[in-house]
């Protein structure tokens, strides 16, 4: 609030940004396990945020026009902001949507349950281990966490048994999974709503509107539907 008040009524600075200029360098383990710096562009970051916004609008339509998060959305930030999930999907999307962020110093399932309760948070994003530990801790304490509406995951495949447990402990919440690359500003695929419930092992569909995905054989030719590839 102090930051907003300090700039209230002041004109925005006149600056020109090259859309293809560097935005950030994020490090990715890639295929070899050795960290490699991926240079992200301004255009790539903005495209990702707009793509997530389009995805959110599509999810709202699929839900009959009802907004899952209500008038006071809030997210538990338990992932680092130097990673695409924390930077793009959590931080920048929160700025765009006016969503409250509550940051954790380090991950602890008990603290997470307490913060969701105290801050009335609606959203939690993290790796599958985090969402599972949160679910088990809430179950142990007999907590439903009524305000929690979304349990998103990425970074690894969430076991199907985890999805069933989330449905059991948090019947009011919906779970989802996303896949992306650091080099693509986290854009990739998304699996949510009824698709996720029917096929939780799937990586989902390409995120609109600029994502194209194809699977190729070892010789680089396109693989057929149902054929293993990369």
What name fits each language-model region?
Residues 8-27, 34, 64-74:
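Conserved pre-ATP/AMP-binding loop-to-beta segment of ANL
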Residues 36-39, 77, 99-106, 176:
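Short beta-strand->loop structural element characteristic of the AMP-binding/adenylate-forming
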Residues 96, 118-126, 135-198, 208-212, ...:
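Gly/Ser/Thr-rich phosphate-binding loop
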Residues 23-51:
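Conserved AMP-binding A3 loop
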Residues 214-230:
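Conserved beta-loop-beta connector loops within the AMP-binding
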Residues 22, 28-31, 75, 81, ...:
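Conserved S/T- and glycine-rich ATP-binding loop of Class I adenylate-forming
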């Amino acid at each position: 609030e102090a930051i907003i008040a300090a700039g209230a009524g002041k004109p925005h600075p006149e600056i020109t940004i090259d859309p293809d200029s560097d935005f950030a360098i994020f490090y990715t383990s890639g295929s070899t396990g050795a960290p490699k710096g991926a240079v992200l562009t301004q255009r790539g970051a903005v495209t990702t945020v707009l793509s997530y916004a389009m995805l959110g609008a599509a999810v709202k339509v699929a839900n009959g026009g009802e907004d899952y998060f209500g008038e006071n959305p809030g997210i538990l930030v338990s992932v680092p902001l130097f990673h695409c999930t924390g930077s793009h999907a959590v931080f920048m999307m929160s700025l765009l949507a006016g969503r409250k962020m509550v940051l954790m110093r380090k991950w602890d399932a008990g603290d997470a349950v307490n913060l969701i309760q105290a801050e009335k948070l609606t959203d939690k994003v993290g790796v599958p281990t985090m969402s599972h530990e949160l679910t088990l801790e809430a179950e142990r304490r007999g907590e439903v966490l009524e305000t929690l509406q979304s349990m998103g995951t990425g970074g690894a495949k969430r076991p199907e048994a985890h999805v069933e447990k989330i449905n059991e402990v948090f019947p009011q919440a919906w779970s989802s999974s996303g896949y992306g690359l650091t080099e693509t500003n986290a854009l990739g695929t998304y699996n949510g709503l009824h698709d996720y419930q029917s096929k939780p092992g799937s990586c989902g569909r390409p995120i609109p509107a600029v994502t194209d995905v194809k699977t190729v054989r070892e010789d680089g030719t396109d693989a057929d539907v149902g054929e293993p590839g990369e």
